[in-house]
């Protein structure tokens, strides 16, 4: 709906028929990128859906102390998710190698600036907020959180369209992939395609996290053959089951 209103408004401003303006919406053009930025919803906050972070710190991260863990945040918006992951890994003595991508260039620009207001914080995940400063991920100044730019030595930020039907080429394999709060934009066919592509970029035994509201709607026919839906208590995720069993599998 937002996208349609944007197209109608811009067609009127340019005095073009609706169909003619639509012809201008070609990928990799300014018009198309502006449409994407207008149509995407970017509500996010630090340590959103805290159960995922609790699971990581109780079940996975203790086994990775002193080791590198590769994580892809595939719909990172303005950066709260990958920053949360970075801080948690640092807190547990894990070497973070994080790739963060999103389709919205405006949100990625906000991420790179690294200035966050109170709206990036929620009661959900509140107990983790203190580690943002404890790990020197950033500092709280004048009711804002200011990101330490050194974080970008460990977080690579890229613009990437999950619906583009191609594999991300900016990393090899990830141990953990976060694809949360993005499947609401996709139909089942696209969800299946995205999960298949993500599975190809996942190391054996690796995990994919969807949002709590999304993973319950993922039927077995959408899950790649190389993956299975697994739960640890009330926390559900997808696990890559082929290949040599990794530390991730052995700890669950």
For the regions a language model picked out, list residue spans one by one.
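A structural alpha-helix within SAM-dependent methyltransferase catalytic domains
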Residues: 57, 61, 86-90, 199
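Core SAM-dependent methyltransferase catalytic element
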Residues: 176, 225-252
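Conserved beta-strand signature within the Rossmann-like core of class I S-adenosyl-L-methionine
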Residues: 204-212
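Conserved class I S-adenosyl-L-methionine
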Residues: 67-78, 99
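Conserved SAM-binding loop of SAM-dependent methyltransferases across substrates and taxa
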Residues: 78-92
């Amino acid at each position: 709906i937002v996208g349609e209103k944007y197209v109608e408004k811009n067609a009127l401003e340019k005095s073009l028929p609706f169909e003619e303006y639509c012809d201008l919406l070609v990928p990799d053009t300014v018009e198309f990128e502006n449409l994407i930025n207008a149509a995407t919803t970017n509500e996010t906050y630090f340590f959103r859906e805290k159960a995922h972070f609790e699971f990581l710190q109780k079940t996975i991260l203790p086994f990775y102390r002193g080791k590198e863990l590769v994580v892809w945040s595939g719909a990172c918006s303005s950066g709260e998710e990958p920053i949360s992951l970075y801080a948690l890994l640092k807190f547990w003595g894990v070497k973070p190698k994080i790739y963060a991508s999103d389709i919205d260039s405006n949100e990625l620009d906000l991420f790179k600036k690294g200035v966050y207001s109170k709206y990036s914080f929620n009661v959900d995940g509140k107990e983790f907020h203190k580690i943002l400063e404890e790990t020197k991920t950033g500092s709280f100044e004048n009711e804002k959180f200011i990101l330490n730019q050194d974080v970008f030595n460990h977080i690579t930020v890229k613009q990437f369209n999950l619906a583009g039907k191609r594999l991300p080429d900016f990393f090899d394999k990830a141990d953990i992939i976060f694809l949360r709060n993005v499947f609401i934009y996709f139909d089942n066919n696209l969800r299946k395609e995205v999960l298949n592509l993500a599975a190809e970029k996942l190391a054996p035994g690796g995990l994919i996290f969807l949002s709590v509201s999304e993973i319950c709607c993922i039927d077995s026919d959408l899950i790649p053959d190389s993956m299975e839906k697994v739960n640890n208590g009330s926390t559900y995720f997808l696990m890559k089951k082929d290949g040599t069993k990794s530390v991730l599998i052995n700890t669950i």
